[in-house]
Amino acid sequence: MTANRIKRFIKIFIATACTVAVSCQAFACKRTINIKQSEIDICADEIRNYLDAKTAQDQFTALANAMGSQLDRQYASIEYSSENGKTYRVFAFNVNDDNERFVVRGRGGKATGGLFIPGETYRLKIVGMSDYDEDFFNATAWKNQYSDYVTEEKTVKIKDSPVRFITLNSGYNYRDLGGWETETGKKICYGKIYRGARTNGFSEKDIAIFKDNLHIKSEIDLRNSNDDGGQNSSILGDDINYLKAPMSQYSYILPSFSLNGRTFDTNSPAEIKRIFEFLADEHNYPLFFHCNAGADRTGTLAFLILGSLGVTIGDLTRDFELTSFSQGGTRLRGKFQEPFEYGIMQDDANNFVAWGDMISRIKSDYPTSDGKLSSSIKKYLTTECKISAEILSKIADVLLSK
């Protein structure tokens, strides 16, 4: 990118960011997509524009138009005919997987949200009851007795996408890690592994989503005693396999790191090994990993997992930057200044965000003959974290499409 192009881009970015800052919050609340068409897109338009952008400049412009605007949810509005005095629920059934189903609450002839999986087809049953029924009012699953109250049925195809946000009532920045394609053409399976923010303060409804709909069996908590709110077990229940593995983020996990008084966290490699050994056990899935905001430590672990499986640097960066569409905080691959600096977005007393610095260090510290980032990540994991090739192979068997 030439100096003149950089200057023009920076001006566009700053001007756009200033313009949208005051309006994106209200705009996000209005954004819905109805399902009268045969295929729907559960991504907000702003996220779709970002995913479809072909150049770094277009990606950053898309981010500037919407970052921080709470778009981390599914934007499908299910419209149906309704009658006064009736309570409505929409039950969604994956036609390819009978175990994958969920409920969306309706009001005023519309039910917004859902847990749809991109690329899948769903059979929707709209159920309306006149008499108050507590089980139905708080329904999280289908019951056969609801069959007598079905008012409409329709089938809908969900547009394919590498992004599946999980809509919650009391949290933000939760999403499925599935959907990304690897260098070999395989895909990360949906419904296996989820990333997100803290679970402290989860509502009963959100706990039900994690247990009854996502079928979470395990939780990996990346926080330490300074920010975990005293949590040392899963709030999802005693039957959840809970691993506390406090690791650092970005370049802190690399022995060569030393910058502006910041240095390598010597404990991180051992914690990463514990995490990957946990990931290698197929009985721990589906699982959920998180830190506090679901951005830095979570983003670093997602990078190691997806990168070791062969997801490209472009898609690794997209997964990282998707946090910018939530309240988790803006996370970019670099910062905007003259000259343009790629690699470190923030380095001050409040935070250290160094996505590009981490990538460049891993590639230079762990070079391989094929020059692939995925190979350098594997080399780091096997040499520095002492993770066996067998462990990495088992994780691939669980998470990659056949």
Regions found by a protein language model. Name each.
Residues 18-25:
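Hydrophobic core
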Residues 2-14:
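Bacterial N-terminal signal peptides that target proteins for export
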Residues 28-288, 301-402:
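Cys-dependent protein tyrosine phosphatase-like superfamily
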Residues 7-10, 24, 295-296:
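Residue-level micro-sites within transmembrane alpha helices that shape
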Residues 1-5, 19, 189, 291:
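A general, composition-driven signal for non-globular sequence regions
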Residues 147, 293, 297-298:
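Ser/Thr-glycine-rich phosphate-binding loops at phosphate-binding pockets of nucleotides
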